[in-house]
A protein has these predicted regions:
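Conserved, well-structured core domains of diverse proteins
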Residues: 1-113, 117, 122-136, 140-141, ...
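Active-site-proximal loop/turn and secondary-structure-junction residues that shape catalytic pockets
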Residues: 119, 148-150, 166-168, 186-190, ...
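Hydrophobic, small-residue-rich alpha-helical packing segments that form membrane-like cores
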Residues: 170, 192-220, 224, 229-235, ...
Length: 400
């Protein structure tokens, strides 16, 4: 029997056949020409995946993770004929700095830089006491940070600030009377308008006892102080702290950089002895990544506004301006001072000096933290491989 002729099926342009082959080849050939997705980058996609699994925002520590204007964008114009330079090897450059010159006992620093407030809890006992010893050797000061005082930090610190925070965790009026200065924490640069965070992994029995909290639970400080609703109340709080310390030591207000001119102007009218301004480059022991990346303003813009605000209310020479945030070395400090700051506070830089993010023999960053030394931002986890930001006794032993 003759064979039946079968009609060949025409290829559908959208399914199968040569169209698929061409599409596949086109995809391979044009991959490099089309480029990468500028909005949903691999990092963004990975971030969404992680948040979908967590069911909440991501927490992290350390400094800002996006590019903003920094002190690297500024350069100095050295003196030539217009201004003679100092002969550093035989002429003295005065570095003594006075915070709160109107006080009976102002804080006098040999250098215009001190260690900012980082709590016992966020940092280990070894880190806190090492910073206290180092600051004293340099003729500088330290600050308790939130959560109260550890006696050895006070003992090793020749000059020491005691921090008053929104939650009052660990606050003790008797300890405040031992301080050389009081710092009222209103905000910080990396999470302006938010309270403090300390993850439960770091809330050991000792930390919990100091803060009157159950151990092992996350500690979240409120965003607002319960003692005031506005500048008038804040002025009363400043006066209350003066009475507590018998009008002898400086009272300092710490602000995160936001509406800098207005905020600093209002703060200065409350008549503190110093105002501490924290730029968005400032680090944190724990905070929401989304807030850190999207709030605040850079220090190089903030300092000038703060200086102008203090001058405009007639407080020049009366209210000391302290800047912190993204300070890495002497050049950054000098630029901040040139912009109008009177003194500098450092945090992350001092932690790095203690081996933060250093590839020490005892630590294996990739195995323990999943990142290389130098890329670690896991301060909030309590598993710091170098013993700086942990309460684990085995890890603390790595910080000698």
């Amino acid at each position: 029997m003759p064979k039946k002729k079968t009609k060949k099926k025409k290829s559908n342009g959208s399914v199968g056949g040569k169209a698929d082959v061409h599409a596949h080849e086109e995809g391979k050939r044009n991959k490099s020409l089309l480029g990468h997705n500028a909005i949903f980058t691999p990092e963004v996609i990975d971030d969404i995946h992680i948040k979908a699994q967590l069911g909440r925002y991501r927490m992290r520590g350390m400094a800002l993770m996006k590019k903003i204007p920094t002190f690297d964008d500024l350069v100095f114009l050295p003196g030539t004929l217009t201004r003679f330079v100092i002969e550093g090897y035989r002429e003295k450059c005065e570095t003594k700095t006075v915070i709160g010159p109107r006080c009976e006992n102002p804080i006098e620093l040999d250098i215009p830089v001190y260690i900012t407030g980082m709590s016992f809890g966020a940092l280990s006992y070894e880190a806190k006491t090492a910073l206290a010893r180092g600051a004293t050797m340099a003729g500088s000061a330290t600050c308790s940070g939130e959560g109260g005082m550890i006696p050895d930090e006070r003992r090793y610190s020749e000059k020491w600030y005691y921090q008053c925070i929104q939650s009052r965790y660990g606050f003790n009026p008797h300890h405040a009377q031992l301080a050389d200065g009081i710092e009222v924490f209103i905000g910080q640069g990396q999470k302006v308008g938010m309270g403090g965070h300390l993850m439960g992994q770091k809330v050991t029995d000792q930390v919990a006892e100091m803060r009157s909290l159950p151990s092992g639970i996350d500690q979240r400080s409120p965003a607002r102080h319960p003692d005031w609703l506005g500048p008038d109340d804040l002025a009363l709080k400043v006066e209350e702290l003066r009475q507590l310390t018998k009008n002898k030591v400086p009272i300092q207000l710490k602000l995160g950089a936001s509406k800098v001119y207005d905020d600093v102007r209002m703060a200065a009218k409350c008549d503190p002895d110093s105002i501490y301004l924290d730029g968005m480059e400032g680090s944190t022991g724990a905070g929401p990544h989304i807030a850190a990346a999207n709030t605040g303003i850079p220090g190089i813009a903030a300092i000038r506004e703060a200086r102008r605000a203090i001058d405009d209310v007639g407080k020049t020479g009366k209210v000391t301006l302290i800047y912190a945030g993204g300070i890495r070395d002497g050049a950054d400090m000098a630029k901040a001072l040139a912009l109008g700051a009177d003194a500098i506070a450092i945090g992350t830089g001092s932690m790095i000096a203690l081996n933060c993010n250093k590839d020490i023999p005892e630590a294996n960053f990739e195995k323990e933290m999943g990142v290389k030394a130098g890329d670690c931002y896991h301060c909030h986890t309590g598993r710091c491989p170098v013993g700086v930001a942990t309460q684990d006794p085995k890890l603390r032993a790595r910080l000698n």
